[in-house]
Amino acid sequence: MSSKQEPVVLGKLGSSHGIKGWLKITTYTDSVEGIFDYSPWLIKEQGEWREVKVLQWRFQGKAVVACLEGVETREHAQMLTNCEIAVTPEQMDTLPEDEFYWRDLIGCEVMNTKGYNMGKVQEIVETGSNDVLLVKANAKDGFGKAERMIPFVTEQFIIEVNLTEKQITVDWDPDF
């Protein structure tokens, strides 16, 4: 793998399907078929990432199955069950200036406009109307908060996202 950055996990290999080495695919992409927009894949096998190419894929009932280059038997496919599927960060689409990948926001320090350190983004929750940052407060939080939930609404609550500095500036009362 040429990238020094960690691979971006997009799914995992499921159980074998049939006797010719096909595997069920679990995808974390927005659309089920979105994972097949990327090639080659990286799979983590015995702690090491290696490149694989998808030769074919198809819907099989409610599942999606794929045939990977070099995997020709059920036994070989079974050995790959539960391996993560990833791509290099360079393979990911470049987003518009005001959009971000969740993976880039996780771990960012969150400061309000008055300079109060609210904590770090631990997780992002999709609510339907907008995403919500789950911010783990610092151990010595002056407001006694363990965590905060801040709607990711740009210009209203999210003032600035600086990925270089890993910092998000918010217009948010630390007592919420």
UniProtKB/Swiss-Prot annotation:
Give UniProt keywords alphabetically: Chaperone, Cytoplasm, Ribosome biogenesis, rRNA processing
The keyword Cell membrane is annotated on this UniProt entry: no
Matching InterPro entries: PRC_barrel-like_sf, PRC_RimM, RimM, RimM_N, RimM_N_sf, Transl_B-barrel_sf
Query: For the PRC barrel domain, which residue ranges apply?
Result: 97-176
Q: Which is one Pfam family of this protein?
A: RimM
An example GO biological process term is: rRNA processing
Q: Which GO terms describe its molecular function?
A: ribosome binding
* Annotated GO CC locations: cytoplasm; ribosome
- Report the locations given in the UniProt record: Cytoplasm
What remark about domains does the record contain? The PRC barrel domain binds ribosomal protein uS19.
The entry's function note states:
An accessory protein needed during the final step in the assembly of 30S ribosomal subunit, possibly for assembly of the head region. Essential for efficient processing of 16S rRNA. May be needed both before and after RbfA during the maturation of 16S rRNA. It has affinity for free ribosomal 30S subunits but not for 70S ribosomes.
Q: What is the annotated quaternary arrangement, including any partners?
A: Binds ribosomal protein uS19.
Q: What is this protein called?
A: Ribosome maturation factor RimM
Q: Which organism is it from?
A: Shewanella sediminis (strain HAW-EB3)
